Amino acid sequence: MKIIFAGTPEFARVALERLLAAGAEVPLVLTQPDRPAGRGMKLQASPVKQCALAHGIAVAQPRGLRLDGRYAEDAAAARAALEAAGADAMVVAAYGLILPQWVLDLPRLGCLNIHASLLPRWRGAAPIHRAIEAGDAETGVTIMQMDAGLDTGAMLLIEKTAIAPRETTATLHDRLADLGGRLIVEAMELAACGGLAATPQPAEGVTYAHKIEKAESAIDWKLPAAAIDRRVRAFDPFPGASTQCSAETIKVWGCEPLQVPPPEGAQPGEILQVDDAGVDVACGGPDGAAGVLRLTVLQRAGGKRLPVGDFLRGHPLAPGMVLGGGAGA
């Protein structure tokens, strides 16, 4: 069975590697154009492109796929390449471009998507982040038959996994990437023998995982400690949770909600205690939900992530200071 693969980041690279290791024939890979990255802002190929080139696979990088859109020439060239590949199916994983109907209709078996959630929960661009932010106890991967909607297609395979209490997007991403790679191999094996059954998504339980914006990084100390903790973990590694101390931005990479209420009269964001174990900060929230958040890993703008004891030696913090707002560093 010939498979066209469309994907861009590390999550997708893992799936492509799994398919190739399983013996899949992949004549063509679609991925996003090279982007400037790093301190020198030099053009860098996506992880999927790097993988494809390492395996001698042809790569197409259209800027768009709409034949009547802004990048019609790119779309026409991509269509010619897709038709020439003569694939039976397309596997899509975090590609980054909307697939128009002509793409969905081209492969004999259609387009299969690897989605990092238990659909219909967390349709959309950031299912891993939003699951952690919401405090979900479990998530998983769904292999979906793509249609014209936003992650609305029929479910082909689905597998659950628990979200660990201190899970971050970084750690959960890696586990789901591995799970997605295993499931897509299983799906293609079933498809080859006609054993892949489709189940429509239920109408109940639909939620949307909207794209993470850098502006979300600012910590709102009026939220309960547990909610802030979830956001810190959800926004690791991007965009990072941050707060202002005087005129300086500090990123918070590690924290722990303490099971104690803040002292009476403490305002949200007020530093209550400072030692090598952590910086304790008063949080807000409704009666009974307010608490104290202990900050354990911090980073100054342009610096490295540091355990709080090391951070304090170069950046003293003291009880009575008030943290607030924040912007991405």
Swiss-Prot record:
GO terms for molecular function: methionyl-tRNA formyltransferase activity. Keywords: Protein biosynthesis, Transferase. GO terms for cellular component: cytosol. Belongs to the Fmt family. The gene is fmt. (6S)-5,6,7,8-tetrahydrofolate binds at S117, L118, L119, P120. This is Methionyl-tRNA formyltransferase. HAMAP family: Formyl_trans (MF_00182). The lineage of its organism: Bacteria, Pseudomonadati, Pseudomonadota, Betaproteobacteria, Burkholderiales. PROSITE patterns: GART (PS00373). Attaches a formyl group to the free amino group of methionyl-tRNA(fMet). The formyl group appears to play a dual role in the initiator identity of N-formylmethionyl-tRNA by promoting its recognition by IF2 and preventing the misappropriation of this tRNA by the elongation apparatus. It comes from Paracidovorax citrulli (strain AAC00-1) (Acidovorax citrulli). Pfam families: Formyl_trans_C, Formyl_trans_N. It catalyses: L-methionyl-tRNA(fMet) + (6R)-10-formyltetrahydrofolate = N-formyl-L-methionyl-tRNA(fMet) + (6S)-5,6,7,8-tetrahydrofolate + H(+). Its EC number is 2.1.2.9.
